[in-house]
């Protein structure tokens, strides 16, 4: 038996299936070193920011910002300044129903984070956007 979710392209296949089966996905993303350079590295986050904006136009997903930053006002100010899409910060969207109202974790279809396989998540999401824009299933 093979570990399906560590096979090549499994992330994209699952993302694609969820999008076409449910017509809407939930994109969660971190702030530091994902959409905003952090102190330690001199890097750009422009490609990820642009992809999130394109996702909003093409996929119409829900967006959750999932961050360790406790200054939510500062986070909101940054998101608005950068015109980054978000529906919730560190919370599930309202359609998520918990068994016994136990909120165990934030639910998402895909997570973009510099410490959690950002390159693979970026590529899978970009591939889905390209596919949906072209109206051809890859």
What is each PLM-predicted segment?
Residues 1-138:
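HAD-like aspartate-dependent phosphatase fold
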């Amino acid at each position: 038996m093979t570990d399906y979710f560590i096979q090549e392209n499994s992330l994209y296949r699952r993302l694609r299936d969820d999008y076409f089966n449910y017509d809407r996905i939930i994109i969660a993303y971190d702030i530091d070193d994902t959409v905003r350079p952090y102190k330690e590295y001199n890097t750009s986050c422009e490609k990820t920011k642009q992809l999130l904006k394109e996702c909003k136009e093409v996929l119409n997903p829900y967006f959750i910002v999932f961050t360790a930053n406790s200054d939510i006002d500062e986070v909101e100010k940054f998101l608005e300044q950068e015109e980054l899409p978000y529906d919730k910060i560190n919370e599930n969207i309202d359609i998520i129903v918990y068994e016994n109202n136990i909120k165990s974790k934030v639910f998402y279809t895909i997570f973009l984070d510099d410490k959690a396989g950002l390159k693979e998540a970026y590529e899978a999401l970009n591939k889905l956007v390209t596919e949906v824009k072209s109206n051809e299933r890859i």
